[in-house]
From Swiss-Prot:
UniProt cross-references to Pfam families, sorted A to Z: Ribosom_S12_S23
Main location: plastid
Keyword rRNA-binding: yes
Organism: Trieres chinensis
Protein name: Small ribosomal subunit protein uS12c
UniProt keyword list: Chloroplast, Plastid, Ribonucleoprotein, Ribosomal protein, RNA-binding, rRNA-binding
Gene Ontology BP terms: translation
PROSITE patterns hit by this protein: RIBOSOMAL_S12 (PS00055)
UniProt-annotated location(s): Plastid, Chloroplast
Subunit structure, as described in the record: Part of the 30S ribosomal subunit.
Cysteine pairs bridged by disulfides in the record: none
Gene this chain is encoded by: rps12
Length: 126
């Protein structure tokens, strides 16, 4: 326990919380342009081909973002919206592309969990 004199001499320092998505710069989402769309493989126990994109943000930062869902229409120069959220088995991928926003279309034929993949409610046939 410090004395009052010690606290007068030098105040207590606040512990700063480190952000997990620094490229967003305190924004919920950021717009960017795809510079490269490619596939990569995950870390050791898992095996798959994951779709990712290198995105140049409006804040002039370059990040790697994951493309969720089955199938996509993204290519170089596509304008996308990214959000925070890492992919655990892909090192260096800390962002997700939001499906159904800007140039990224929603996942085709998706009926469950539609809001996460930018899919409108299907017309009910009677």
């Amino acid at each position: 326990m410090p004395t009052i004199q010690q606290l007068v001499r030098s105040r207590r320092i606040q512990i700063k919380k480190k952000t997990k998505s620094p490229a967003l710069v305190n924004c919920p989402q950021r717009r960017g342009v795809c510079t490269r769309v490619y596939t990569t493989t995950p870390k050791k126990p898992n095996s798959a081909i994951r779709k990712v994109a290198r995105v140049r943000l409006t804040s002039d930062l370059k990040v790697t973002a994951y493309i969720p869902g089955i199938g996509h229409n993204l290519q170089e120069h596509s304008v996308v919206l990214i959000r925070g959220g890492r992919v655990k088995d892909l090192p260096g991928v800390r962002y997700h592309i939001i499906r159904g926003a800007l140039d990224s279309v929603g996942v085709k034929d998706r009926t469950q969990g539609r809001s996460k993949y930018g899919v409108k409610k299907p017309k009910s046939d009677k």
